[in-house]
Curated annotation (Swiss-Prot):
Zn(2+) 1 binds at H65, D89, E145. Its cofactor is Zn(2+); Co(2+). The active site is at D67, E115 (proton acceptor). Pfam families: M20_dimer (PF07687), Peptidase_M20 (PF01546). Binds 2 Zn(2+) or Co(2+) ions per subunit. Keywords: Cobalt, Hydrolase, Metal-binding, Zinc. Belongs to the peptidase M20A family. It comes from Methanocaldococcus jannaschii (strain ATCC 43067 / DSM 2661 / JAL-1 / JCM 10045 / NBRC 100440). This is Uncharacterized metallohydrolase MJ1497. One of its GO terms (molecular function) is hydrolase activity.
Length: 346
């Protein structure tokens, strides 16, 4: 077993601000120096940091992401906890994956550069592996995210769904087609659209939530255009088609246009279907479902990899000023992730 000062590595990584591309490059340089000092090969492929012992021979991919959301709080620590943006989402879990990699023979470590934004890194990396025919049948993957040390066998899909509405600009005292009023009807109608639910350890539901709305240029002018962006989370397949079909039946349908925000890739709803693997893992770990979205979907879609999500930290603390990592949980995660990696490929 390789002995590492994981708390020092984690502190160093959290102190590198990675809510921007320059910071991500600095963090990857830090990781490269770390592995170079260990005599372990590493490189950058499609923007992802990759460490490997045998580049052509691996049956387990260990993944997490180095980027964070915009900084909510700076790093600090006490005897019990580390605090600050990134300690659980996901640099603490980067360190867990590093430990699993160092203590397994046939694994590949892949760290994403942009999971919180476009997901271009993993999207392109998975296609790179597929196109190079570098994937063995039956490959497995662990994605490091804050799951409170539960093994999550799936995650929600996420989409940015835009509805644009159109009318004619005119004086606010006149009557007629108002794009803002149209969008208010769209929002209320979608709130009443029946959505699916699933049960894993508890009930998880799809959701359609308006998060951005824009329109208008002056208080006394009815605008000719407005739009609303919905954050769509799914525990069902084809939810976008479901929304499209629903809106197409409304009497305002000829005055709206709907589409996905084209500026990013989207991870759809994912659920592990390997019942034998689930049963094996359930003997050692609590089985749950990741109530957000992550990049596990891409490993399954492009590489046909049986993928689970595992890591330290409570999901509800991520992206908040209250983000913290309990050090006892971190120690437990270090021990458990090594066992989890063994179970995935035995």
């Amino acid at each position: 077993m390789i002995i590492m000062d994981y708390l020092k590595i984690l502190e160093d990584l959290v102190k590198i601000r990675t809510d921007n591309r320059i910071g991500v490059k600095k963090a990857f340089k830090y990781l490269s120096n770390l592995f170079n000092n260990l005599g372990i090969k590493n490189t950058i492929i499609e923007g992802c940091f990759v460490a490997y012992k045998e580049k052509e021979n691996f049956d387990l991919i260990l993944n997490s992401h180095i980027d964070t959301v915009k900084i909510q709080s700076n790093f600090k620590k006490d005897d019990n906890n580390f605090y600050g943006t990134g300690v659980i989402d996901a640099k603490g879990n980067v360190v867990l994956m590093i430990h699993a990699f160092l203590n397994s023979n046939n694994s590949l470590l892949v760290i994403s550069p942009d999971e919180e934004t476009e997901s271009n890194g993993i999207y392109n990396f998975c296609q790179y592996l597929r196109n190079k025919n570098k994937i063995q049948r039956g490959i497995k993957c662990i994605v490091g995210e804050p799951t409170d040390l539960n093994v999550c066998i799936g995650h929600k899909g996420r989409f940015e769904y835009i509805v644009e509405s159109f009318g004619e600009a005119r004086h606010a005292s006149s009557q007629g087609l108002n794009p803002i009023e149209i969008l208010s009807r769209v929002i209320l109608d979608l709130k009443n659209l029946p959505l699916e639910k699933i049960k894993v350890d508890k009930i998880y539901s799809s959701s359609i939530t308006p998060t951005i709305i824009k329109g208008g240029i002056q208080s006394n002018i009815i605008p000719d255009y407005a739009y609303v962006l919905f954050d769509v989370r799914s525990v069902e397949k084809d939810i976008i088609k479901k929304i499209d079909d629903f809106l197409s039946q409304k009497n305002y349908s000829k005055h709206i246009k709907s589409s996905l925000n084209p500026e990013r890739h989207y991870a759809n709803f994912y659920m592990l279907e390997n019942k034998e693997l689930i049963n094996k893992l359930s003997k050692h770990f609590k089985i749950s479902f990741f109530n957000a979205t992550c990049e596990a979907y891409y490993f399954n879609k492009f590489l046909k990899a049986d993928t689970i999500i595992y890591g330290v930290g409570k999901l509800e603390l991520a992206h908040s000023k209250e983000e913290y990592l309990n050090l006892n949980d971190f120690d437990r995660g270090i021990k458990e992730v090594e066992k989890l990696a063994e179970l995935m490929i035995e």
